[in-house]
Amino acid sequence: MSKAWKLKLLLLLQLLLLSQHDVDSASVISYLPGFEGLLPFHLETGYIGVGEGEKVQLFYYFIKSENNPEEDPLIIWLTGGPACTALSALAFEIGPLTFKTEGYNGGLPSLVSTSYSWTKVASIIFLDQPVGTGYSYSTTPLSYKPSDTGEAKQTYEFLQKWLVENPQFVSNPIYVGGDSYAGIVVPAIVQQISIGNEHGYKPQINLKGYILGNPSTDLDSDHNSKIPYAHRMGLISDELYESLKRTCQGNYVKVDPTNTKCLKLMEDYGKCVSRINEGLILIALCDLASPNPYSGEHGGRSYLQTLVQSDLSLPTPDCYMYRYLLASHWANDEDVRRELHVVKGSIGKWMRCNWDLPYEKDIKSSVPYHRNNSIIGDYRSLVYSSDHDMMVPYIGTEAWIKSLNYSITDDWRPWFVNNQVIGYTRTYANNMTFATIKGGGHTAEYKPEESFMMFQRWISGRPL
């Protein structure tokens, strides 16, 4: 081979390497369609390949702390579902942007800044996980079903590779966080990281703890706690509650079909709560369709979300689901996808929650993971519940925490903001803090200021 050809070949290889680097590297986003002017924070988006042959490409949004990103904690955050996009957390719950619902008259929805973003004091990776969620995709048809344990392994692999690409964050305190169904997966991710660190896998992850909001823990137990919760909140009578307890023996999920008395009482219970918004029992249900989209017969939240995604029955601006419609319009816009550097043709229609994704719920309870994590590592944990959330009632969360038999170091007491009671808290010897948010719903979006104050105090090591 001539010297000239060797030089050409070398140049070609260099170009290929540079091209590959451009594909793998994150993109810094300074402008977003719908937001006026420069973004007032540092946003990156990108993909990281995981699994066999890196066929699974996980999409993420990364926002640097607006305070001191060199030293502030780094959080990897998972949305619930399963298969609800990270954009939900970023735009509706704990991020620095949200959709403007007032005055929308068609076209691309507008984005506005929020006042209580958790990125004011921490850097956050918002991850579209599992594959098939948000903008995450697979380069080939999957030969397996995404699952809880699979998601835990892939999230650990993602974090390792992200830190290799961003070594400046390796020494930052790292936390894993999530809400709703992520309560099943986050403790398993913590265990994966712990095992990896123990085996000396590189990079070592400077894991300090985890954060769970209104977390699912054991789906049957979570559901069973709705009956006593409904009684505590005055949604069912004393007589009905006592009859349910006695006749159904505390099992309201898998009712024996021969127990006709229990089935009849469950019907009576359904009549009492069928028009209650489980996400926040204080607000009205959206009358998008009949029968009630929150009834178990139609899959609850997933049925309501399907209506929004199908455009068959659109919510009005006063409906809490209206912003989800705006998110769908925005995330499916070609200009938006181009600015976010979404791989063209990688997914079809973007959905806030992909309820049709085949998914194996192979972790029946995350309680054993909590136990293991308290033994493996000296981790801090924050578990918070809003007292008006009926999707995952706080009394079920209190029950599984109690089952861990941790000793109490700071007993039940109110916590305050501006001398007002915001909720109640209790701290345990294993560095677990439990907190309630008074008047809140299923996610932080219903009480953004209070949720931020709780997070800010806890992440800085101060008592609530």
From Swiss-Prot:
UniProt xrefs under SUPFAM superfamilies: alpha/beta-Hydrolases
Principal subcellular localisation of the protein: secreted
GO molecular function: serine-type carboxypeptidase activity
Cellular localization per UniProt: Secreted
Active site, UniProt feature: 180, 389, 442
Any one annotated GO CC term: extracellular region
Disulfide-linked positions: 84-353, 248-262, 286-319
Pfam families documented for this protein: Peptidase_S10
Glycosites: 372, 405, 431
Keyword vocabulary terms for this entry: Carboxypeptidase, Disulfide bond, Glycoprotein, Hydrolase, Protease, Secreted, Signal
Signal sequence region: 1-25
Record EC number: 3.4.16.-
Function description: Probable carboxypeptidase.
Similarity-based family: Belongs to the peptidase S10 family.
Protein name: Serine carboxypeptidase-like 18
